[in-house]
Amino acid sequence: MEQETFEEQEITVADINANVPQEVQNYLRSFNKAIQEKSLKEIEEHYEYKWRRTTDQYFKDSRWPEPVYIQAMFEQEGQEDSYFVSLYPELYYRDVYYRSSNTNIEITVEDRHASYDHYIELINMFVEPDAPLDLELPNKWLWDMIDEFLYQFQDFVIFRSRVDDAKTESDYQEIAERPNAWNVTIVLNALHSLILKSEINEQLEAYRSGQNPTEMAGAFGKSSLYKMLGCFSLVGLVRLQCHLGDYRQALQIMKNVDLDRRFIFSLVPACNVSLHYHLGFCYLMLRRYQDAFRLFESILIQMASHRGPGHYDGGRKRDTIVCLLALAYSLLPQRLERSVEHLMNEKEGENIRKIQSGEGADEAINHLLLRGAPRFLCPFLADPQQPPEEDVLKAESERQLELFKQEAKQLILLGQIRSYLKLYTRMKLEKLAKFLELTVPQLRSMLHSFKHKMSQIVHTPGGEPLAGERQFTDSVDFYVDGDEICIATMTVKKSYGDDFLTASLKMVTSNR
């Protein structure tokens, strides 16, 4: 993978002391020692808590010391080969991006390019050796690396594509001089290289077929570091393909994953949420509403059970998922677990009613899509040296969402047919046509459309995410016998098991 180097600066001990407070130096040395000793508990403490505490104490309104000073500090102490020297820039630039939204810290084009270079250097550090690195890092840190790598790629694409006056001629020149910086092909290759090195697909395939994954893995596959990097890179690829609008490819990436036994991805809650959200959205856009329901409902139940101090707080993402669930429910109602249905109606009940009634449906669909859909990306510009003539990302989002809205409008009309069919067991075509203000030939065409739209590919347990069986997914089925419609309404008996499990889960959670 491409990497550009810059002229090294001569850093003296005086420079280090002037830019890195002594207490911060001690903290970084302690952090480095924890990594060298492979003490995951100590690493987690430094990564999760002490970093935040040190930031608040010394760098509340400013940046951490630049990576060159930290590198020089460890070189002065004869530890230039320390893993921490390669890991620190990732922490540094992630902190810059995070705090740019609520401080006076600004991200420059130089920052964006430098962060890209450090990420490529870091990924090369993992994939280039012939033997696994003698390194252990917490799963959350590994996920955060992949998550931040993709976030910064998305942010760069948005920044480069934005039509505004914030970018100067110098910015455009810097971007043009580095055409491969944050190039989508290089980003994809970086994730694929981690997946290949980790042998994660081979292990997942073995697991699905009932074999021992460890026996299928080589030295890299047996390393926890590489195994988790491979897992998280798979989820990152799903996310990236989803943002690029390639929904089938996003599902194909997970071909070796049993979606009903995905415990390895739940080791980091944020990773688990990302996987469910992006796969669910892909199913939604592919008109596989039943599968979307299943994933959205499952993750909302899991998120509810992990609330509380010390747990992942995905409030914003939860609301986003609820919007997509409400959208799918409005178009094709399904039976939901009681607590999920209550949450959905509480937050988006009004929009559901608007869509199902047809009054204000366009406004409600727009609201749910804009709040629930991911940010679509168009990673290429006609001329990187010139400001774009239009907001290409907005245009791409409008194109993707318009495709879904066309489908939604058809389903809303079919929903009106469903509401009449549920009231009868037999009904004359002419009678229903009068209710709908249609001719009988028009109604016949609509009934054919109803049958087609309600027949969907549904994932089969243990099968690949993209595969499935065609099933009729509506609660109302019918056939036309001459000039009469024969209707069968399928009802599901109330299951008290769900209520019992939900109450038990709440009791366990409240007693923690």
From Swiss-Prot:
Any GO MF annotation of the entry? translation initiation factor activity
Listed under GO biological process in this entry are: formation of cytoplasmic translation initiation complex; translational initiation
Q: Does the keyword Electron transport apply?
A: no
Q: Which keywords does the record carry?
A: Cytoplasm, Initiation factor, Protein biosynthesis
* Location of the PCI domain: 291-477
The primary site where this protein sits is cytoplasm
What are its GO cellular component terms?
Answer: eukaryotic 43S preinitiation complex; eukaryotic 48S preinitiation complex; eukaryotic translation initiation factor 3 complex
Q: A Pfam family for this UniProt protein?
A: Paf67
Role, per record:
Component of the eukaryotic translation initiation factor 3 (eIF-3) complex, which is involved in protein synthesis of a specialized repertoire of mRNAs and, together with other initiation factors, stimulates binding of mRNA and methionyl-tRNAi to the 40S ribosome. The eIF-3 complex specifically targets and initiates translation of a subset of mRNAs involved in cell proliferation.
The subunit structure is: Component of the eukaryotic translation initiation factor 3 (eIF-3) complex.
Q: What is this protein called?
A: Eukaryotic translation initiation factor 3 subunit L
